[in-house]
Curated annotation (Swiss-Prot):
It is a single-pass membrane protein. Its cofactor is FAD. PANTHER family: MONOOXYGENASE, PUTATIVE (AFU_ORTHOLOGUE AFUA_8G07040)-RELATED, OXIDOREDUCTASE-RELATED. Induction: Expression is significantly up-regulated under xenovulene A producing condition. FAD-dependent monooxygenase; part of the gene cluster that mediates the biosynthesis of xenovulene A, an unusual meroterpenoid that has potent inhibitory effects on the human gamma-aminobutyrate A (GABAA) benzodiazepine receptor. The first step of xenovulene A biosynthesis is the biosynthesis of 3-methylorcinaldehyde performed by the non-reducing polyketide synthase aspks1. The salicylate hydroxylase asL1 then catalyzes the oxidative dearomatization of 3-methylorcinaldehyde to yield a dearomatized hydroxycyclohexadione. This is FAD-dependent monooxygenase asL6.
Length: 423
């Protein structure tokens, strides 16, 4: 029996899922629809932590990721005068406590491109157990779902419709799939989004002369709390990241034009003595600025009938955990593995997907307690910097790595012999 699958979203989770599905001994007819007219070129820097690198290695893609990786060497804290107070070196992926920056740092667009091209290659490989039928359709998305006993009828944005055995929502934190099926009632708002109290902004700007050879991720905190980060390791540009407390206005940000969104940041950015005026000037000129209230996605169950969520659409851990990419890869792997394991029994596969993955997601969504209240005042920020300096100088962060290693490995990545990977 050929299982007909619709995947909504051609981001990290969607393209990763297709790669894993194409290694199944079962036959799939897969359609991936993406709202954008092409693969999205925008996006910030991502990293592979814990199980992320091993999963890319299973797919035979780790060297391609390495080729595209950004050589970031350390995460530093600087004060308003640019003086460095603490430095934490890169963490080797999958080993010990997960640091802020890791061995595999890659731009989102590059990672998606690697997964996208690989999925097309493996789906057409006659030596795999498939081959699987695969097509990508851009500029299209689902707008209505009707569930039957074992099928889902999907009406698309272009007016067409079709039936599928399984629909996968891999369409990100603001998933249309989730909003259509998981909101308790129309007009109630997306109750599955749990805001963290921080709003983040991102954009790229030209490198300054002193950043030409820099491989550092620089971070400056000030009272408010407010944060300004510059990631300097990319050879072509510097990535600016901003963080401020969330307001109700931020939650309606998508209804505002880009220029109004940027104006919301001008006061906060301009208040930074370190790099503030430079970043403000570049912000005003930028055409790739993106802002979002930092939120997690939490739902009681990731599937409804024959519709299932994967990646940020179902369990976004937020940028504050630093594990979003890895969570998407793990979720895609487990979903594909359970589908392969249970064959035609899709309902059993979805039940097992929930049971196997839930403990990992619960841990992955834990946000470290930073005592945000201490950052409200200059004194509190100063105390935090002193603590960071002590931790960095005495290399206590390495001690934390050793002590927390066992805790990080309590959940084990399952093996699925039903998925065929190259030796």
């Amino acid at each position: 029996m050929t299982v007909k699958i619709l995947v909504s979203g051609a981001g990290v989770a969607g393209t990763a899922l297709v790669n894993f599905l194409c290694r199944s001994k079962h036959e799939y007819d897969i359609t991936v629809v993406e709202r954008a007219p092409a693969l999205r070129a925008a996006g910030s820097q991502l990293d592979l932590k814990s199980f992320g690198a091993p999963l890319m290695r299973k797919l035979g893609l780790i060297e391609k990721v390495r080729e595209k990786s950004i050589h970031e060497t350390a995460f530093t804290f600087v004060d308003s005068k640019g003086r460095e107070w603490a430095r934490f070196p890169v963490n080797e992926a999958g080993k010990g406590y997960e640091g802020i920056t890791s061995e595999f740092e890659i731009m989102r667009a590059d990672l998606v491109a690697v997964l996208y091209e690989a999925s097309k290659e493996v789906s057409a490989n006659p030596f795999m157990k498939g081959p699987q039928k695969l097509r990508y359709v851009f500029g299209k998305h689902g707008v209505h779902f009707t569930q039957g006993n074992s099928k889902v009828n999907v009406v698309f944005s272009d007016g067409s419709s079709d039936d599928y055995d399984l629909v996968v929502g891999a369409d990100g934190q603001y998933s249309m799939t989730r909003r259509l099926l998981w909101e308790p009632e129309k007009g109630s708002g997306d109750t599955t989004l749990k805001y963290t109290g921080v709003t983040a902004g991102f954009f790229q700007m030209p490198k300054s002369e002193d950043e030409a050879d820099s491989t550092l991720f620089k971070n400056c905190l000030q009272a408010g709390p407010r944060g300004l980060c510059l990631r300097c390791a990319h050879k072509d540009f510097t990535q600016a990241m901003l963080g401020i407390p969330t307001t109700d206005e931020h939650k309606q940000v998508f209804k505002k034009p880009l220029e109004q969104q940027k104006q919301m940041w001008e006061e906060s950015v301009g208040s930074f003595k370190w790099q503030g005026q430079r970043v403000l000037a570049e912000l005003r000129k930028s055409d790739d600025f993106y802002m979002t209230p930092v939120a997690q996605v939490k739902v009681d169950r990731w599937s409804k009938g024959r519709v299932v969520l994967v990646g940020d659409a179902g369990y976004c851990p937020s940028v504050m955990t630093g594990r979003g990419t890895t969570v998407s890869l793990v979720g895609a792997y487990v979903l594909a593995g359970e589908l392969a394991k249970h064959g035609d029994n899709i309902d059993a596969a979805l039940e097992s997907y929930e049971k196997v993955l839930r403990p990992f997601i619960t841990t992955a969504q834990e946000i470290p307690s930073m005592g945000m209240g201490m950052f409200q005042s200059k004194f509190g920020v100063g105390v935090f910097y002193v603590l960071l300096a002590i931790i960095s100088k005495l290399k206590i962060d390495r001690l934390l790595q050793a002590l927390m290693k066992e805790e990080k490995e309590t959940w084990e990545l399952p093996e699925y012999p039903e998925l065929e990977f190259e030796a």
